[in-house]
């Protein structure tokens, strides 16, 4: 029975602990402070900045707001205004102004009003949302958490491949011995994404570059979450989305960059900068995972042309979309570009789907 400010303080520490424990976030952030602990708070009041997180190995800081609400509550513009203003201003390290590299709003509700949605879109520095549905999936063993002792929090246990997945893994690896392109066809719900990760681990042996292409941001989030939770090697994660809204197929909602579960990059130069910085300081073996929407494939292509980096394997999810058969008027060209090795340099390509497209002879 805590009062509201005690609840708020508990929730901030709860989120801080998630950032330091979750396999997704602890690989990205090397330190997380409450505002009171933040060494550069300048003795100022928090004005809505509840936590500050420092990116691993880089002098980049993220401002975080933690919103502890009923799950039916809708986050409003008024709820985020103060935070947006405060985090738009610099803080000082040894008298030198430093701007936040990005901003994150964590909430225990999935609901946002239209005005609140509109206000966080296209902000500089960018705003990312982590909502209740995302928190549930960040790789925490929720049964381990004791409300009065947050240090009890543990990572969720990793899975082991099921017999049908073992068969799929060995068949794909066998195929790749003689050819550089293959298909992985598995029914929905049988663990395609997980199976693909185990294929990637076997190919890279913990050291390499992997591109995973998806048609939507929600699939990008799902895949990224699953892969970093289940990966048995050290990894670095890069999320790439296009600047414009990533639209999905008809009848589905338009998604936005604010919904990527880790901060996403929208341009090739920024991606090169991020990759090069980490490449220069990291001497340990890692798998570098690049998660991208098909709509942003241009960014990946430019990035490769600048760095000369080649992917060891590229995974095309929902691969039936890459056949070039389009709905009337739909722009599917981004989906087809992945086949072209002069556009995306990759030693191997794996096309994944639950629904392969089959053509009658006359349509070939």
For each predicted feature, which ranges?
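Conserved RecA-like helicase motor-core motifs
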Residues: 27-32, 233-248, 261-263
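Catalytic centers of nucleases
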Residues: 7-98, 113
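Conserved Walker A/P-loop ATP-binding site and its immediately adjacent core
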Residues: 208-231, 238-249, 296
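SF2 helicase catalytic motif II
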Residues: 306-350
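Catalytic P-loop NTPase motifs of RecA-like helicase/translocase cores
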Residues: 72, 220, 321-325, 358-359
